[in-house]
Amino acid sequence: MTRRNNPELNDEREPIDKIKASIDLKKKTIRRNKRKRRLIKMLQFLIVIGVLIGIYYFDKSDASRVHNVRVNGNVILSDAEIKDALNIHENQRIYLTFKPFINHKGKKVKGIDNIDANVYYRQGIINLNVTEKKAVGYTLEPSIRIYFEDGFYKELETLNPSVIERLPLLVGFTEESISESLLSALATIDDGSMASVSEIHFEPTKVEPDYMRIVMNNDYFVFTNVETLPQLNKYATIISGADSNARCIEFIEYGPTEETQSAVVKACGS
């Protein structure tokens, strides 16, 4: 006999089968998503490991290092002094070296006015274009020192004629008398007038504790204090109309401005 399906039972099983199929599909989807997430995490982990390994080997390679530091424009400060002040040396990691940081740090170095750095990462080269502060004088005693306008000085073991050829020799000064105001006043003197100065002797008096006698290289003498020292910029004009026998020039101050200052040219000893 042929067995007949009960339509009512079939109708009851259909929703159950659909629910079961839906549950199975969801389980498969969840398992598939889990596998996908695990795969993505594994790929991310491998990428991170690969990047770290790449960074490690790059850091160990010559390509990551500074091969050459070139210092240009410095006259008095040595290459080594500038490198040490900036903490930049060969064989350092060049990818940790940035131009803005070098330029900013350079402004804080004594004796340096400005640094314009260029970093060539592929070649491993750092160029330091240096502008020094203006040098305004030098001493021989108690030691050889070159003084800059910002108050910084550099000591030298031996005298370099090319460095001091246009600088005045400071004679009789103590560390206290080489004040910031003196160095600032010397910095205002133009190069042409400064080149005419041979020596500056510190000869204080009771009335003027910062009095100086300046020996010019054309047999003239200038007497001044710190306040009137900038009048030396008018030196060429002053002597152009002076009597050839009048070799002593005294800067006189009537007030705090250049308009209230004057120069008297007279025979020495008069």
Curated annotation (Swiss-Prot):
Presence of the UniProt keyword S-adenosyl-L-methionine in the record: no
Membrane topology value: Single-pass type II membrane protein
GO terms for biological process, alphabetical: FtsZ-dependent cytokinesis
Subcellular location: Cell membrane
Cross-referenced PROSITE patterns: POTRA
Transmembrane segments: 39-59
UniProt entry keywords in alphabetical sequence: Cell cycle, Cell division, Cell membrane, Membrane, Transmembrane, Transmembrane helix
All ranges on the Extracellular side of the membrane: 60-270
GO cellular component: cell division site; plasma membrane
Boundaries of every POTRA domain copy: 64-135
InterPro entries per the UniProt record, alphabetical: DivIB, FtsQ_DivIB, POTRA
Parts of the chain on the Cytoplasmic side: 1-38
Function: Cell division protein that may be involved in stabilizing or promoting the assembly of the division complex.
Family: Belongs to the FtsQ/DivIB family. DivIB subfamily.
Name recorded for this polypeptide: Cell division protein DivIB
